[in-house]
Amino acid sequence: MNLTHYIASIENYPKEGITFRDISPLMADGKAYSYAIREICQYAADKEIDMIVGPEARGFIIGCPVAVELGIGFAPVRKPGKLPREVVSADYEKEYGLDTLTMHSDAIKPGQRVLIVDDLLATGGTVKATIEMVEKLGGVVAGCAFLIELDGLNGRQALGDIDYKVLMNFPG
């Protein structure tokens, strides 16, 4: 199935010169959404994954159904102040400065094998911060899966040697 037909491209959003890749049409089509989730589950099948980790908000939309399908847990990554218990945090670079992500400090047990799932790999800042937190908690990042990679933004460099799966590529 060619999933690119289910991605809307919005020019000059959220600002001039940016093309936003909207996954809403993919989610609105049960067959396409299901296909995308199954593709990620197949990728994860031989990795002995213990936990799915997904950054807010679209990482939840992709990661939760993957976790349910695999019969494992899901750990959310949130912006500061959104999680009620003790957290670990990691800073990452955005276009105009630093931002921070957090996750519960008991979300990952030492030695757990984690699959990080998100909608988009662009510059790699979000996934790099997520990897840092998982490893800080003693987890092992066994792989990453993304619906979309924006080519030319060097996001894959943030992954280092970590294996990853991308379902679609678009120009960055």
From Swiss-Prot:
Its EC number is 2.4.2.7. It catalyses: AMP + diphosphate = 5-phospho-alpha-D-ribose 1-diphosphate + adenine. InterPro entries: Ade_phspho_trans (IPR005764), PRibTrfase_dom (IPR000836), PRTase-like (IPR029057), UPRTase/APRTase (IPR050054). GO terms for cellular component: cytoplasm. SUPFAM superfamilies: PRTase-like. Transmembrane segments: none annotated. It is found in: Cytoplasm. It is an enzyme of class 2 (transferase). Pathway: Purine metabolism; AMP biosynthesis via salvage pathway; AMP from adenine: step 1/1. GO terms for molecular function: adenine binding; adenine phosphoribosyltransferase activity; AMP binding. One of its GO terms (biological process) is adenine salvage. Keywords: Cytoplasm, Glycosyltransferase, Purine salvage, Transferase. The keyword Cell cycle does not apply. Homodimer. Catalyzes a salvage reaction resulting in the formation of AMP, that is energically less costly than de novo synthesis. Belongs to the purine/pyrimidine phosphoribosyltransferase family. This is Adenine phosphoribosyltransferase. It comes from Streptococcus uberis (strain ATCC BAA-854 / 0140J).
